[in-house]
Amino acid sequence: MAPLQAIRKYDYLVIGGGSGGVASARRAASYGAKVLLIESKFNKMGGTCVNVGCVPKKVMWYAGDLAEKRHHLKSYGLSTTDDKVKYGDFDWSTFKDKRDAYVKRLNGIYERNLKNEGVDYIYGFAHFANSNGDVEVTLTGDQELSFLEEGKEFKKDEKLVFAGSKTLIATGGYAINPPNVEGHELGTTSDGFFELQKQPKSVAVVGAGYIGVELSGIFKALGSETHLVIRGDTVLRSFDESIQNSITDYYTDKLGVNIIKQSGSVSKVEKIDGDRKKITLGNGQVLEVDELIWTMGRKSLINIGLDKVGVTLNDKQQVDVDQFQQTANPNIFSLGDVIGKVELTPVAIAAGRRLSNRLFSGDKAFENDHLDYSNVPSVIFSHPEAGSIGLSCKEAKEKYGEDQIKIYKSKFNAMYYAMMEDDSLKSPTSYKVVCAGEDEKVVGLHIVGDSSAEILQGFGVAIKMGATKKDFDSCVAIHPTSAEELVTMK
């Protein structure tokens, strides 16, 4: 068989059209680099975040949040009843159509931004073809590629080969289900959540991480009978215990999610009564629901011929990189979810831009440019929201020693709930500031309560700059707000 011949050589080949890949491609092109971006999902530029992640999830969260607020109206004299949203009140299918149309508009915006920056892009599966790093692309749909040949339509499954001086692997990840569970295929993943054509009357969500917490909160707020199956006693076990306990208790005691603790996970799934599912748990408990959602994590998309170019993986089967995003191959780089460091959209964007600054700007000021992965803020769009930056209380004690740590905590009902006599309507506000050393440097901040995502952004800047508790105290509070508690704690 004759060796493959590249039809065009680029300065930069970017494999993956998610947030990190697009950001790096555009930044490289802004410096004059000749860039080709390859995205496997046909006409779905933007990656997980735009298509099956943070963007459509946040739209669904807004719907759930409004549903929760509906039964607050009576307390403010705007309704004569305080009925909660019931199954059937929410027009799932119409809302899905609107949400999907919004995502489609974003796909188009991503494409236009690439064109405006002079980035060539193609829809197809990329695979390293040889040890030189040439990339073979199998097209995933019929498409015009005017940068190759004006007016010609290239056909689905056609193969094209490209060469690049530098290559970026930004392939992201995919949602998993447990293959060893009998009947696992009867459930869907968090990706499949966005494909549901109708709202399930009852649903089981399996997994205690932020995706499971967010989706179960949305389902319950919109009126579905909701079961959250977890192996331990709390949700969000990778977060500070204050967040774990606050969200677990609120979901159980007030929101009405049936959290099944110490479940032993799922041992078997069977189909019953049409499309309903019978779920047998490891602890012997049995659930019968309309829908099963697996939220048990994601794996890196690595099946692209990495062995041919000497790119190595870590023990979690994620692409191994150094602090400069460089793989074991000096001409191949990687970032985003596929490396598994901090799997957040803004992190991938920041890493991608810094990488292109270093590789293509020609500016010595950027020759050591790389992303600092510490003190990255993250939020959970639960009901209520939660946010975190820095070290948990446990992590801080392990790093600095227990005698060097001081904790400031506050738990209260936000002023918004003052008009409500029924305690079941009130969601908690819980704040924790973790400080280390004699100067009480703030090394962790963990908050639960309404608007936590918006509140955390500004405090994230302060903590990234090395703020101390004294700095917090010296800030004049904005009154009346919940956030003022963070600068008035004693």
UniProtKB/Swiss-Prot annotation:
Matches recorded under InterPro entries: FAD/NAD-bd_sf, FAD/NAD-binding_dom, FAD/NAD-linked_Rdtase_dimer_sf, Glutathione_Rdtase_euk/bac, GSHR/TRXR-like, Pyr_nuc-diS_OxRdtase, Pyr_nucl-diS_OxRdtase_dimer, Pyr_OxRdtase_I_AS
PROSITE patterns: PYRIDINE_REDOX_1 (PS00076)
Binding positions for NADP(+) per the UniProt entry: A208, I211, E214, R231, R237, G297, E343, V379
Catalytic reactions of this protein: 2 glutathione + NADP(+) = glutathione disulfide + NADPH + H(+)
SS bond partners: C49-C54
Subunit note: Homodimer.
Intracellular or extracellular location(s): Cytoplasm; Mitochondrion
Binding residue positions for glutathione: S19, R26, Y110, S246, R353, K432
Cofactor(s) recorded in Swiss-Prot or TrEMBL: FAD
A GO cellular component annotation in the UniProt record: mitochondrion
Residues at which FAD binds: S19, G20, E39, T48, C49, K57, A126, D337, T345, H479
Protein name, as recorded: Glutathione reductase
UniProt GO molecular function: flavin adenine dinucleotide binding; glutathione-disulfide reductase (NADPH) activity; NADP binding
Its job: Catalyzes the reduction of glutathione disulfide (GSSG) to reduced glutathione (GSH). Constitutes the major mechanism to maintain a high GSH:GSSG ratio in the cytosol.
Note: The active site is a redox-active disulfide bond.
The enzyme's E.C. designation: 1.8.1.7
Keyword S-adenosyl-L-methionine: no
Location of the active site: H479 (proton acceptor)
Family: Belongs to the class-I pyridine nucleotide-disulfide oxidoreductase family.
Cofactor: binding details: Binds 1 FAD per subunit.
EC supergroup of this enzyme: oxidoreductase
PANTHER family the UniProt entry points to: GLUTATHIONE REDUCTASE
One biological process term in Gene Ontology: glutathione metabolic process
Keywords assigned by UniProt, alphabetized: Cytoplasm, Disulfide bond, FAD, Flavoprotein, Mitochondrion, NADP, Oxidoreductase, Redox-active center
